[in-house]
Amino acid sequence: MQILSIDTSGQILSIAILKKDVIEISEYPSGKMNSEKILPEIKAMMSRLSINFSDLDGVAFGAGPGSFTGIRIASGIAYGIAYSLNIPIVGINTLEALATLIDNRHCISCIDARMSQVYIGAYQVNNLCITTINEPGLYDPEVLPDINFSEATIIGSGVITYKNQLAKKYKHINLNFIEKEFSLAGVIAKLALPKMNKNFNLDQAQPIYIRNKVAQTILERNSSK
């Protein structure tokens, strides 16, 4: 099976193609990319691998949470490709994708949500098998959710910004911090593979907008100026 994966939910834009057991990944600073530039990069990558769009068996994308604009771009491109080829599409939770990047079976995924807030989810991980312990949520860094792990790794862009608040809130946990932004398209492709279903419904793969009123709120602010 050959799967195209796109993630533009964070500061690193990544594109991946899973071809049998081999993953090819390309990364770019997301600030320099937009929807008009991504498609040519996808085409160039497929050309390097001698793959045509008609060879794809499915499309996956980082469904969020994360950058509202980035998620919208990735989902739009993924839907366009899936719809035109009539192939399955799968959206993968970016907090879950982060959790699979570490060896520790207890993970707290933490993504900087901007606007002085953070997205957090807690997971138990065994290879690519994920059990949700705390559902993903949007929090102020001073009012973080209770998480009852004895030890855990905290991973994601939110650690870079809010390490002190996280350390204070979870001082009862033996913590390992990973302060780094990750590209996720590769792991998203792997997570999407078992979810690809020939009896698919394009409407089932929806973006995860935890802060679902952000665009409207910004518009209202601008209108009031």
Language-model region placement:
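N-terminal beta-alpha supersecondary unit
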Residues: 1-63, 182
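DPxDG-like acidic metal-binding loop motif
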Residues: 58-88
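Phosphate-handling active-site elements
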Residues: 48-54, 83-94, 200
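Residues at secondary-structure transition points
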Residues: 29-40, 68-72, 76, 93, ...
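Acyltransferase
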Residues: 176-225
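Surface "functional belts" at beta-alpha junctions
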Residues: 30-33, 88-181, 209, 214
